Regions:
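Flexible coil/turn residues that form the inter-helical turn or adjacent wing/linker of helix-turn-helix
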Residues: 10, 28, 71
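Conserved catalytic core of two-component sensor histidine kinases
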Residues: 21, 48, 55
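Conserved beta-strand->loop/alpha-helix structural units within folded catalytic cores of enzymes
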Residues: 29, 51-57
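Extracellular/periplasmic head regions of type IV pilus-like filament subunits
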Residues: 56-59, 63-132
């Protein structure tokens, strides 16, 4: 005797497909947020490295030109003391297009207000010390 077996169709139901799409959407939203945050942290670190380079170049310029505390300098004064392999050394601007300078010997370069505000969610004020 032959038993009756219902024909089972292969494939996924609409509900199963919608659940998978919802899970993928949630994972991509989380990943996108983390990528954007990591990018901003990298921008903050790069800006801080640029400020340190400028500070060293300003010190070299001041020693070579016999400048003392309180004397001012422009970016063009310290530019020859920077490595020319990065955008900051060529343009005199940070990643947000803000100009570096003028500088004062012994106080060094400062992070611009625009850059500080743009990166404040990943780099608090203590991060920028002594360049704030």
């Amino acid at each position: 005797m032959k038993t009756f077996r219902p024909h089972r169709r292969a494939g996924f139901t609409l509900v199963e497909i919608m659940i998978v799409v919802a899970i993928i959407a949630m994972l991509s939203a989380i990943a996108t947020n983390n990528v954007l945050r990591a990018r901003k942290r990298t921008q903050a670190s790069k800006t801080l490295d640029d400020l340190r380079s400028l500070d060293g170049a300003l010190d070299q310029w001041a020693m070579e030109k016999n400048k003392s505390a309180g004397d001012s300098a422009q970016f063009s004064d310290v530019q020859p003391y920077l490595k020319t392999m990065n955008k900051m050394a060529v343009s005199g601007q940070d990643l947000f297009g803000q100009n570096y300078g003028p500088f004062t010997v012994d106080t060094g370069p400062k992070v611009s207000t625009v850059t500080f505000n743009a990166l404040s969610d990943v780099a608090p004020a203590s991060f920028w010390s002594p360049y704030k």
